[in-house]
Amino acid sequence: MRAALIYGGDDKKLELFAKKIFSAIGRKGNELKVIKVGRGINAGNLSPYEFIFVGCPVLSVFKGKLPSELIDYIKRCTGMERKKTIAFIISRLMGNDKTLKNLMSLLESKGSFIVDFKQIRDLDKDSELLASRIKY
């Protein structure tokens, strides 16, 4: 099965999580395309993918602010309609619920179907857990 991982924001734990979930999905015989959004990254067509993972770090305690480059990328993407999507954040002490809610709202505004969401606390355990959510 083909999946895409889209993530934005400068966070070392997020980078490490992307590597761990890439390995976990590969071990299960699935293909994962990793897309780190940033300046100069063109939004693509996500139609070829059956599953889409989207994640970011928590940037603010109260407002649930998302990385601007992630918002811009998702808004410009095509092919997200009716896609099975998993939203995740790299959790902090505070601000987790609001950030996750805002991320899911952004994805749903593009027509994605959220099948799971997760606040990432244990990189190893949570990468295996989310990788196991890919089902035919």
Question: What is each residue range found by the language model?
Answer:
Residues 3-9, 13-37, 44-136:
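FMN-binding flavodoxin-like domain, especially the glycine-rich phosphate-binding loop
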